[in-house]
């Protein structure tokens, strides 16, 4: 026993690990220094969700113009601003790392500096939402047709506007989209809002080929993407929301959007209840566009029913534009806002493709 003790003592002196000691259980020698602690990333400051969201949408191109973003952030009464992070052209509004796929396919553009924009919005007390277009992506599909919805001959399938769409069944597409969303979250955006989170709604859909397609219903594929996206983004401290079609609350539009199912995973749902987009006779209205307040009220009634028991709040997109004239009269925009408020929405977001808004209605 005395000899064994001498051997053990010698081994310990030489720095060997003795079985049964704490050092052995930790996988290091008794005399080695403890491994350095992993430095935690400092939490990114966030602006809380406003009591009433009163917001507008801004394109990345507009944000690149001198003084334009400052103007939007200074609109009296504005509490939220949605800025394109990844748009329907497939462009990402800021520079991603040089090794990223977005840079390799030419999608990453220096329209704005994400951290600087987030800091500016935070200083103004404005809640910053990053819009991320998901599956419509002509830029990615042009460079990577293997990630696209395809034709029978293997070419990139295109919708009626001639735009390619990424394949919703391909997880590589999911991760590509989320790379931009995560970058915006880390830069300080308060919320990521997914748009075009669906299958195509127009074009020669009957000829579309989806590599890797399963027997799973499209609505479950979209739900799986949304669930996956939230598990990736929530640890970064951002809220997550979705844009959905205005009629998706009561109808299967064939694009995979089921609001009641999707609302299980996100913080907010933003239905696009644009009165000009409803056909005559919808909600028993001869001309829904001519009755904007009633159209929004009927639409949000259906969404409130679809979201019963869900945690997601309702923040609709309203129409501050017109398909038949340059501008929609202010009283018609106000009628939509009033309808949203009566429907117990958590606020509203105004959409105008040209970025010109009826600013006095945000007060």
Predicted features and spans:
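Substrate-binding cleft of secreted/luminal carbohydrate-active enzymes
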Residues: 266-280, 288-363
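Aromatic-lined carbohydrate-recognition surfaces of secreted/lumenal glycan-active proteins
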Residues: 56-61, 127-137, 193-194, 200, ...
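The substrate-binding groove and active-site-proximal loops of carbohydrate-active enzymes
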Residues: 54-62, 97-111, 161-175, 212-220, ...
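Catalytic domains of carbohydrate-active enzymes, especially glycoside hydrolases
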Residues: 67-92, 183-193, 264-268, 340-348
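Active-site-adjacent "subsite" loops/lids of carbohydrate-active enzymes
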Residues: 48-63, 119, 135-186
